[in-house]
């Protein structure tokens, strides 16, 4: 595994890739996730980073080999992407494009909240992960008037079945729940949570009304 080229990445592209590694930690083991959350992103240890990239590659390789046609466990790799793709699409439509990994990181915030309320994901691990995202990725800003637009974008995600929004959620780190759904009210509640915990209410036009 050749990781020397990681040194050439600017900060934004580094964090974009790191978001996928964070996802791998969430679908792997508590130890793997803890290492990712503890990594010093301001003073990068490239030797340690190389070993962490290797672990991420192993996680993805194991899943893809087990389910090459994505009929089952490979859907675990979609964690954070259902909402993340909607954020990407909205950002592009508004001519404020974002890197894929940033959208995934923000999507993880939303989908960990769904995991917390629907499948019992531990609140402390949700909060730890959200804090890491908040500190390293900032936030994607939107207001409540855009909830319907985001919802419609999510309905058109290629991973859906028969028009039903499909989520990959977690009961615990590494305990994956595939093919999960949520009604519109719950999804809007998820957006409320995201905007509150990420500080978006401070920057959007409807803040005074809420």
Regions flagged by a language model, labelled:
Residues 66-68, 91, 187-199:
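Catalytic, metal-anchored helix/loop core of enzyme active sites in primary metabolism
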Residues 34-148:
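Active-site segments that bind and position negatively charged phosphate/pyrophosphate groups
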Residues 137-144, 148-182:
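Phosphate/ribose-recognition catalytic cores of enzymes acting on nucleotide-derived substrates
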Residues 203-208:
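Conserved small/polar residues in nucleotide/adenosyl-binding loops
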Residues 6-8, 84-85, 175-176:
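Short, acidic Gly/Pro/Ser/Thr-rich loop/turn segments
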Residues 1-39:
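A glycine/threonine-rich phosphate-anchoring loop and its flanking beta-alpha core
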Residues 19-24, 54, 131, 152:
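Generic alpha-helical structural context detector
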